[in-house]
Amino acid sequence: MQVILAVIVWMASSVSSSSFTASTLPDITNEDFIKECVQVHNQLRSKVSPPARNMLYMSWDPKLAQIAKAWTKSCEFKHNPQLHSRIHPNFTALGENIWLGSLSIFSVSSAISAWYEEIKHYDFSTRKCRHVCGHYTQVVWADSYKLGCAVQLCPNGANFICDYGPAGNYPTWPYKQGATCSDCPKDDKCLNSLCINPRRDQVSRYYSVDYPDWPIYLRNRYTSLFLIAKSVLLLLSVIITIWVKHKYPNLVLLD
């Protein structure tokens, strides 16, 4: 799950006509953006080698996209420190992949494919990694079935983040090797080598709480400071009341 920092020199003559600009970067509600994020992930998950017998289909989650968007806006090129703090109503921990590169070369497909390309460093039989593999293993983590992505223009380039639920990258294999779909959960069907379930794959639209523009960890920090200060003031008021009653026993305190 390490951060990819892409330092790329790109000649103006090679910029694609489909490149994004600061004003055309897609929002997390953009249907084409959502479709591409989901489609590319599932295409890559369906072609893993060796084949997977328990690879779940990934579907979009608006809350994960909100969390990713809030963190991209911080322009802090490191993982969200709240990923294991149950910031999602359905998952105790989240996975996260980060891509940083020139806006002129950014595309959803190229960013996600760059994560998947880490497969060349990963030995499935031994789970050994020769370089960086965490982005690849999260993309193909069989039990991660929800994702939400966001992209933000930052001073150093385009910051593209995908968050996953439940989190992957535990000290075990990313998926079970075997005949495709031979170990899908009960009631699942097989489609393009992926385990699908309409109920599980339904896109929830009931989330109504939006994260503010400032980073999640700052919001939690300020909330904690407020609660601590409130507790300290309450304790001080109790101590002062006891001291006054002890010092002036005949004093009548008005409520």
From Swiss-Prot:
Provide one Gene Ontology cellular component.
membrane
Q: Which part of the chain is the SCP domain?
A: 39-164
Major subcellular site: membrane
Tell me any Pfam family this protein matches: CAP
Q: How does it sit in the membrane?
A: Single-pass membrane protein
Q: Which keywords annotate this record?
A: Membrane, Signal, Transmembrane, Transmembrane helix
- Its transmembrane ranges are 224-244
List localization entries.
Membrane
Please name the SMART domains in this protein's record: SCP
Q: Where is the signal peptide?
A: 1-17
Please name the InterPro entries in this protein's record.
Answer: Allrgn_V5/Tpx1_CS, CAP_dom, CAP_sf, CRISP-related, V5_allergen-like
Q: Which residues form a coiled coil?
A: none
Q: Which family does it belong to?
A: Belongs to the CRISP family.
Report what the protein is called: Glioma pathogenesis-related protein 1
| Species of the source | Mus musculus (Mouse)
